Amino acid sequence: MGRWGHCLFGHDDAIGHAIKVSKDVAQGDDRQFAHMMSRVIVGCPPGVFGFYVEEYSLAEKIGPGEMEASMDQLIRHKLDSGLGDELFEKYRAAEQHGFDFDDMSKYLVIIFAAVLMGYGAKIKESQIQHLRDLVPKLQCNEGVVPPFGDSGFRGPGKRQFLAALDHYQAGKRRSFTQPSCHGCGKVNGDIKAEGKTLMKCGGCKNERATAWFCDKDCQKGLWKHHKHNCGAPLGRGIALFRSFGKNSFGVIAYDGANV
């Protein structure tokens, strides 16, 4: 479907899964749902961001800024008190036993794990191993794919997720909207001890799809793929909302489809 960035949440299918997860975690609490959704859509194109803000009346439900930390703690406590394990098993059962068109059930488990890491919630070692086993089973493309065949990961998003698993620590939040190396998936916190800082690709002119690299080796290693995405935004992209919102169908066009 529509993809405006290379990383995990730069894709309308990922947003759709995150909506389901947010509803399941919030359990009918509108403020918790709005808080979770605001984190997920922060890097979306304006049209996509605006669609969800209006569709779910997010601006009316989000509390003042000082409430964010306490809301994070509340959600993590819910997840750590059994809800995280319960939902993991629920989604995993659907992945194993249901009809899995475009690996959607598998992708849901990945997005749920990203949400868990986003709140620093507990993930069991057996669950982490299942996630590692699941990643290679999902479609992964390094470059532009026609929208209706564009499911699963982009390469940088896959590496971003695997790096997050490698550096996972219970109680420590991991943002999937911060820059990450497109070559190895690491974020600044992962490479700080090595004296490195992420560098933005000088050739990228597409703000939401700009590539970042932790060193020249990662940049050179990915160049055969990245050169096709580097440069100015090309054409128009389309995000298809299907049944993710309250409406049955929605379409938003945005600048730059060379991702």
Regions found by a protein language model. Name each.
Residues 1-259:
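Short alpha-helical interaction motifs and adjacent low-complexity tails used for partner binding
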